[in-house]
Amino acid sequence: MTIIRKKHPLIKIINHAFIDLPAPSNISSWWNFGSLLGLCLIIQILTGLFLAMHYTSDTATAFSSVTHICRDVNYGWLIRYMHANGASMFFICLFLHVGRGIYYGSYNMIETWNMGIMLLFAVMATAFMGYVLPWGQMSFWGATVITNLLSAIPYIGTTLVEWIWGGFSVDKATLTRFFAFHFILPFIIVAMVLVHLLFLHETGSNNPSGLNSDADKIPFHPYYTIKDLLGALLLLMGLMILVLFFPDILGDPDNYTPANPLNTPPHIKPEWYFLFAYAILRSIPNKLGGVLALILSILVLALMPFLHTSKQQGLTFRPITQTMYWILVADLLILTWIGGQPVEYPFIMIGQVASIAYFTIIVILMPIAGMIENIILDLE
């Protein structure tokens, strides 16, 4: 068996990635989220595949087909809610994974980090298009509002929007192409994940101490395979509690009303995992400015390797930057809350302050804190 594992051209790749991989001996549970994201992706692709077997991407029948899945297909309700809530679990793991990367300075592995940012964009695009497919009120109006943002691009904006819509409004052509993209993107994401792993295995994993762990490595299997299995069980337990007891807690009631272009819902808002970005978008009065801020809210992560001023990698022994980090986390929670609130006083003001704070902490305060800590710890 050992010979096959180490010699076979295909199995050898799996062996080097998941079995004989030298891993740091001290990586904590924060390093579990990579494998959990892999599990989420598998769940989403499988449930999505079974949903696609019964779904019809036509404005006349899309809403009915989703109802049909929930009522008439064997365990269709289970598949549908696993897919919908699986997306939420996916984003929870994504945010924790990125948060871990920021906390422990993993962004210094630039190729892996940039690939991760591209993955984040791809997953967000996929989730957005998936939300349009049930063709409820929030699906339709969410698609209308978000695609309409592209009209802010000078000169080509309006043409671009009509090209994406396939007409002069969100209609049958839009739904069909969104279904096509929503189906193909996860497979592109799988390919990107493999590249992400390829880059990671060039450098090896970071660890909580932020020190080089070459002198103290252990094999990935059995130590981390069993640890990942425990994480997977906890994730599945959380997902199934959500699916079986509170399937609609994260959804919008408006999406149980079929799409109606003549009736605008009082509060148009995306799924909870986009609310922080939506709040940043809304906090800028200018349309193009809002769109740029929206893109920058994620793209600012790409600047982190260049804003790293500290002589230490992680925040483990850096109390000032640690404080900044947790203020940033609180700020993101505030933005998420604001994104779901109506556009009125005092929410507008809170959103603007929180948006400014978000960029200020990342671009200005954390690098300054790093420099101060170098001086305090006499590392200059």
Curated annotation (Swiss-Prot):
Note on how the cofactor is bound: Binds 2 heme b groups non-covalently.
Gene Ontology molecular function terms on file: metal ion binding; ubiquinol-cytochrome-c reductase activity
GO BP: mitochondrial electron transport, ubiquinol to cytochrome c
Superkingdom as given in the UniProt entry: Eukaryota
Binding positions (heme b b566): H97, H196
Binding, heme b b562: H83, H182
Cofactors: heme b
Membrane topology: Multi-pass membrane protein
Role, per record: Component of the ubiquinol-cytochrome c reductase complex (complex III or cytochrome b-c1 complex) that is part of the mitochondrial respiratory chain. The b-c1 complex mediates electron transfer from ubiquinol to cytochrome c. Contributes to the generation of a proton gradient across the mitochondrial membrane that is then used for ATP synthesis.
Membership in a protein family: Belongs to the cytochrome b family.
Identification of the protein by name: Cytochrome b
Natural source organism: Phenacomys intermedius
Upper lineage: Eukaryota, Metazoa, Chordata, Craniata, Vertebrata
Gene name of the encoded protein: MT-CYB
